[in-house]
Amino acid sequence: MTEEYGLDGIDIDWEYPTQKSAGISCSPEDTHNFTLLMRDLRKVLGKKKLLTCATIASGEYIDFGNCIKYIDLVNVMSYDMASPPKHHSPLYASDISGWMTTDAAVKKHLEKGVPHDKLVVGMPFYGRGLTPYKAYVPRPQVLTGVEEKWSAESQVPYMTDKNGNFVLGFENVKSVTAKCHYIIEHDLRGAMYWEYADDYEQGDLRTAVAQCLLPNEQQGTRGKKESQ
């Protein structure tokens, strides 16, 4: 199929080996089965096609020590890491974050044997909120009837009600740019986001990511952090 349709490769999003959380069947052997799957896919794809995988922020359920040699990119799903009233995709820890953050997710994967040049940081183009908000709030629906605030510690925006209570965590241009700067500073492979349709029609968030991470045509390097 990759040859027939001229595809770059295959991405595997198995949520998650040995776990039933996504309503799928599982086996205690699935961590090993995942390694075997990566091995067999690499044999079929050869060296010219990409083989990538999506992983939980904690880096659990996959034996990277044995399977990373088959994989080109590891797309870390560094979102949905906490439920409201905590932010689901903080860069760093704060009073609005849970125990897992984007920074912690990167460190977990490095500890488990994923090289920095194979690590891709995930960014959500949606928010997670409390009632009366839906659990999943596309970006264009975010800025209505509440006050926007910024966490300097976690480097993410959030919304509060009239009493100052956290009601919604989301991303904006400032926060995705902060994550892009983190990627550059830690020499990681790049970024991915979920999902394209959740951005504004004019593409505020995806444009910010592209401008920060894609090579500068004149300098031949990634975008540089602006002076503060």
What are these regions (language model features)?
Residues S25-N33, K47-K48, Y200-K225:
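Short acidic, glycine/proline-enriched helix-loop-strand junctions
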Residues Y92-I96, N163-E171, M192-A197:
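Active-site rim elements
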Residues M1-P17:
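Substrate-binding cleft of extracellular glycoside hydrolase catalytic domains
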Residues V120-G122, G190-E195:
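Conserved active-site loop/cleft motifs that coordinate metal ions or position small ligands
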Residues P17-Q141:
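Substrate-binding surface in catalytic domains of secreted glycosidases
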Residues D8, D72, R189:
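Receiver (REC) domain switch/active-site residues of two-component response regulators
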Residues M123-Y182, A208-Q228:
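Glycan-binding loop/region signatures in secreted carbohydrate-active enzymes
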Residues M1-E3, A57-G65, E171-I184:
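Short, acidic/polar
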